[in-house]
Amino acid sequence: MENKKMKLWKKILIIVLILCAILAICIVRKFIIITNLVNEAKEYVNKTNYYAIVQSLQNGNVNMAKSYNKDGNYLNTIKNYGKDNQDERGLVKYKKDNEEIGIIYSGQEKIAILNETVLANISVVNIFSTFDNFLPRLQLAAMSRITTDNCGNIECYLIELDNWKMWVEKDTGLVIREINGGMVSERFYEFDIVKDEDIIKPDISDCKIQE
């Protein structure tokens, strides 16, 4: 009788060890994928020349952000189209050398703010570098599901965690599509193509000036 119990416990222990080994292999695989994406993304962390577009949809509201950046100078715009609001709303942020202009508008009403950093810069490049530290990487590897998928003919890793889905381009570590709860966003990037003439000073002739 004792021998039978011992054999049963050995079988259970072997099954548990096999399951633990499979789980460990899955976590290690995901950890390696995340690490590779972080390493790929490092090439883009300090890029100072890029053009980016971000389009997001949430509760029927559409936001379109565009950004031209070159060596510390930039022209950023955000436009918002609400399902219940026919007026276009948005903001413009311009910086070239020592000159800064911010424009906030809603319909025909426009306010220009000159040479004051009162509008936050628009962050449009989403780089998979948040998980640069070991512990966040390990947590994501343990809790997420990672598969391969195509997003707009781009080969990606699809990372899923609860209501959060993120498509990360395999070759760059750039996030090109994201679903977070009720918000869906898509991103497009081009690097090292922005010229000085792309950063056009906005016309403020029809704006109310706030200095």
Residue positions per predicted region:
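Short, solvent-exposed secondary-structure boundary motifs
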Residues: 54-60, 75-87, 130-141, 155-160
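N-terminal leader/targeting segments and the immediate start of mature chains
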Residues: 2-75, 81, 108-109, 198-211
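Generic detector of low-complexity/intrinsically disordered segments
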Residues: 10, 15, 19-21, 25, ...
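Gly/Pro-enriched, hydrophobic low-complexity segments
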Residues: 78-92, 148-209
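Residue-level marker of intrinsically disordered, low-complexity segments enriched
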Residues: 12, 20, 51-52, 60, ...
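Flexible, processing/modification-adjacent segments and terminal tails
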Residues: 27-38, 43, 98-156, 160-161, ...
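An acidic-aromatic
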Residues: 65-129, 177-188
